[in-house]
């Protein structure tokens, strides 16, 4: 049952073709380990693809990697970003905002937030460069972004309209400390600041909507990834356990 739940994380969070008949409750139960299992797995695939692309396209490899990143995620989180953008643009009561959040049509708010995401993501991927640290930048960013999405679900009560939010909140509400502990090897002082500021912004958004949801978590994962990646690139993971290990590896060999 445990292996079934872990494998189901791949089919739920990614487009990797792993068959699973696990229920949503089983997936939610093991979702607290997905930042490590899914985050690192995605980063390794992205790194391998990027290395191959860089040999052909050099700096432009980052642009192509943008498509790879979203393909690996099956565009699931991107849908949440579009829905949240529409909800944020609605003026008025909570009911109207929730209606926009659940609406399948894409409005100007969704397109606007998508453009914000793409702008940051393109800058981050173009700045990725090619060095020994590249893979660690991607690992850290994937782990951090997945963690913040799940941390939101674990610490903020779900909106009544979100069945997925309720299930994940019930399974994760006792795992918030575990989620933070998973970050220790991958987070730097600068990314702690980004994490806290991003969480506070999303907490305020959740309050205006009446709680968290799967869409909000997905939007958080999507939008925070390029922010963490850009921070990693600028600071080179300074003062993180991962950067210390990288430094020791490079200078001892």
Curated annotation (Swiss-Prot):
Record's bilayer topology term: Multi-pass membrane protein
Highest rank taxon of the organism: Archaea
Example GO BP: cobalamin biosynthetic process
This enzyme's EC code(s): 2.7.8.26
GO MF: adenosylcobinamide-GDP ribazoletransferase activity; cobalamin 5'-phosphate synthase activity
InterPro entries: CobS
Compartment list: Cell membrane
Pfam families: CobS (PF02654)
GO cellular component, one term: plasma membrane
Membrane-spanning parts: 33-53, 106-126, 132-152, 178-198
The keyword Magnesium belongs to this UniProt entry's keyword annotation: yes
Principal EC category: transferase
Pathway(s) this gene product operates in, as recorded in its UniProt entry: Cofactor biosynthesis; adenosylcobalamin biosynthesis; adenosylcobalamin from cob(II)yrinate a,c-diamide: step 7/7
Cofactor: Mg(2+)
Catalytic activity as recorded in UniProt: alpha-ribazole + adenosylcob(III)inamide-GDP = adenosylcob(III)alamin + GMP + H(+); alpha-ribazole 5'-phosphate + adenosylcob(III)inamide-GDP = adenosylcob(III)alamin 5'-phosphate + GMP + H(+)
Keywords, comma-separated and alphabetical: Cell membrane, Cobalamin biosynthesis, Magnesium, Membrane, Transferase, Transmembrane, Transmembrane helix
Function: Joins adenosylcobinamide-GDP and alpha-ribazole to generate adenosylcobalamin (Ado-cobalamin). Also synthesizes adenosylcobalamin 5'-phosphate from adenosylcobinamide-GDP and alpha-ribazole 5'-phosphate.
Membership in a protein family: Belongs to the CobS family.
Official protein name in the record: Adenosylcobinamide-GDP ribazoletransferase
Gene designation: cobS
């Amino acid at each position: 049952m445990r292996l079934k739940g872990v494998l189901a994380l791949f089919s739920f969070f990614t487009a990797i073709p792993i068959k699973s008949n696990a229920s949503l409750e089983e997936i939610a139960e093991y979702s607290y380990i997905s930042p490590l299992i899914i985050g690192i797995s995605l980063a390794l695939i992205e790194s391998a693809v990027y290395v191959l692309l860089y040999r052909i396209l050099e700096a432009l490899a980052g642009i192509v990697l943008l498509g790879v990143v979203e393909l690996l995620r099956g565009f699931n989180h991107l849908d949440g970003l579009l829905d949240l953008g529409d909800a944020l643009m609605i003026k008025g009561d909570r009911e109207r905002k929730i209606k926009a959040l659940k609406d399948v049509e894409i409005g100007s708010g969704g397109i606007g937030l998508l453009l914000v995401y793409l702008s940051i993501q393109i800058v981050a991927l173009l700045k990725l460069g090619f060095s020994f640290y590249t893979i660690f930048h991607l690992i850290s960013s994937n782990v951090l972004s997945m963690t913040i999405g799940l941390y939101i679900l674990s610490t903020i009560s779900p909106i009544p309209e979100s069945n997925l939010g309720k299930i994940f909140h019930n399974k994760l509400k006792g795992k918030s400390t575990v989620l933070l502990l998973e970050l220790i090897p991958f987070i730097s002082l600068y990314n702690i600041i980004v994490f806290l500021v991003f969480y506070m912004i999303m907490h305020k958004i959740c309050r205006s909507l009446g709680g968290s949801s799967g869409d909000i978590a997905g939007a958080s994962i999507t939008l925070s990834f390029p922010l963490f990646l850009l921070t990693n690139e600028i600071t080179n993971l300074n003062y993180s356990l991962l950067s210390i290990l990288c430094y020791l590896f490079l200078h001892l060999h």
